[in-house]
């Protein structure tokens, strides 16, 4: 499994990722999405047309990358919250990949592009164990104190295997709140899936620290060293941040480039708007930022995949698309 060879960094050095899938999905369904124990994943089963429509909303606004609707998907979660069999749980994760593929196929047909086009890429969304727990712990990582790396690897392996077998272009290991889980899932991909392309994205609570309180720059650098130790730099699409306040991103990335020295670590960023998620209410509070206004400084720092996370909509992605296109970066 490789990213289609018709695309490479030389031909398109900055890629625009979609925005917040479940945020946009909420506009395409009548039921409440935030606060659901399966979040958007439920709709792969109950409203696949809305899932395809949500992918298309981002593709039609310039996204080079879409993520499967699997952030909060797990076989265990589907068994627990949908009351289905394990076999059906596996099928629903496979279906999520197929829905993304259907959206890509429809979009390419709309723009008159060949069906085998490399872009847009479809990345398998691999969210943290805390998302399955449905208790807000993906914003603390406190479960790392109660679990071993081996347990976390075993839990992540099933979904990764299913996504890769279903034909994603790569894996988005995302919203990881603590270094132990980030290392566990990165090691799993490096050692068990030798052809898989991937990025690793950490969740941070301020300008210096991951959700767990660990230093972001040190954690990200240790992940980079891990990739280097396996000589897997060519498989890494980026290391970075997501589901984070955009105001924190530049200080966080600057701290990483400082400790990285002469190493040029490929960077990925897709922030929220800056509102706060209230776990008790299952909703967002506060006012947000226009993500596009931060993009110039992020690109200056070496970001090569940029987009949005929660509450970042297709109109925001279009604004990012227009800015990136306006740079007119020559290969």
Curated annotation (Swiss-Prot):
Gene Ontology MF terms in the entry: betaine-homocysteine S-methyltransferase activity; S-adenosylmethionine-homocysteine S-methyltransferase activity; S-methylmethionine-homocysteine S-methyltransferase activity; zinc ion binding
Coiled-coil residue windows: none
Cofactor: Zn(2+)
GO terms classed as biological process: methionine biosynthetic process; methylation; S-methylmethionine cycle
Pathway noted in the entry: Amino-acid biosynthesis; L-methionine biosynthesis via de novo pathway
Catalytic reaction equation(s): L-homocysteine + glycine betaine = N,N-dimethylglycine + L-methionine
Positions annotated to bind Zn(2+): 243, 309-310
Tree of life domain: Eukaryota
Its EC number(s): 2.1.1.5
Phenotypic effect of disruption: RNAi-mediated tissue specific knockdown in glial cells, motor neurons, muscle cells or the midgut results in reduced adult lifespan. RNAi-mediated knockdown in neuronal tissues or in the midgut results in sex-dependent kinetic pathologies with males suffering reduced locomotor functions while females are unaffected or show increased locomotor function. RNAi-mediated tissue specific knockdown in eye imaginal discs results in progressive loss of eye cilia from 10 days of age onwards.
Domain Hcy-binding, first and last residues per copy: 3-324
Gene3D superfamilies cross-referenced by the UniProt entry: Homocysteine-binding-like domain
UniProt keyword list: Metal-binding, Methyltransferase, Transferase, Zinc
InterPro entries: Betaine-hCys_S-MeTrfase_BHMT, HCY_dom, HCY_dom_sf, Hcy_S-methyltransferase
EC class name: transferase
Family, similarity comment: Belongs to the Betaine-homocysteine S-methyltransferase, BHMT family.
Function: Involved in the regulation of homocysteine metabolism. Converts betaine and homocysteine to dimethylglycine and methionine, respectively.
Official protein name in the record: Betaine-homocysteine S-methyltransferase
Species annotation: Drosophila melanogaster (Fruit fly)
């Amino acid at each position: 499994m490789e990213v289609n060879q018709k695309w490479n960094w030389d031909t398109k050095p900055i890629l625009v990722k979609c925005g917040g899938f479940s945020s946009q999905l909420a506009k395409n369904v009548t039921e409440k999405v935030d606060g659901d124990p399966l979040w958007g994943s439920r709709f792969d089963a109950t409203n696949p047309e809305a899932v395809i429509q949500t992918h298309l909303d981002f593709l039609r606004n310039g996204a080079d990358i879409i993520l499967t609707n699997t952030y909060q998907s797990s076989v265990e979660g589907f068994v627990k919250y949908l009351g289905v069999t394990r076999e059906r749980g596996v099928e629903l994760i496979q279906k999520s990949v197929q829905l993304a593929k259907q959206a890509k196929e429809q979009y390419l047909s709309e723009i008159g592009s060949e069906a085998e086009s490399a872009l847009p890429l479809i990345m398998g969304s691999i969210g943290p164990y805390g998302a399955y727990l449905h208790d807000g712990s993906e914003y603390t990582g406190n479960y790392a104190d109660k679990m071993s790396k081996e347990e976390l690897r075993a839990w992540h392996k099933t979904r990764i295997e299913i996504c890769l077998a279903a034909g994603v272009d790569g894996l988005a290991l995302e919203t990881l709140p603590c270094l132990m889980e980030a290392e566990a899932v990165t090691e799993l991909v490096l050692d068990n899936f030798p052809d898989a392309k991937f990025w690793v994205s950490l969740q941070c609570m301020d300008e210096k620290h991951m959700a767990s309180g660990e230093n972001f720059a040190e954690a990200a650098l240790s992940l980079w060293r891990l990739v280097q130790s396996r000589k897997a730099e060519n498989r890494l699409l980026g290391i970075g941040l997501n589901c984070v306040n955009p105001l924190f991103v530049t200080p966080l990335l600057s701290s990483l480039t400082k400790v990285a020295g002469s190493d040029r670590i490929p960077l990925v960023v897709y922030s929220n708007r800056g509102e706060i998620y209230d776990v008790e209410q299952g909703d967002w509070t506060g006012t947000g930022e226009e993500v596009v206004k931060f993009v110039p400084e992020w690109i200056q720092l070496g970001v090569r995949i940029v987009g949005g996370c929660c509450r970042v909509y297709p109109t925001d992605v279009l604004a990012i698309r227009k800015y990136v296109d306006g740079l007119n970066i020559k290969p």
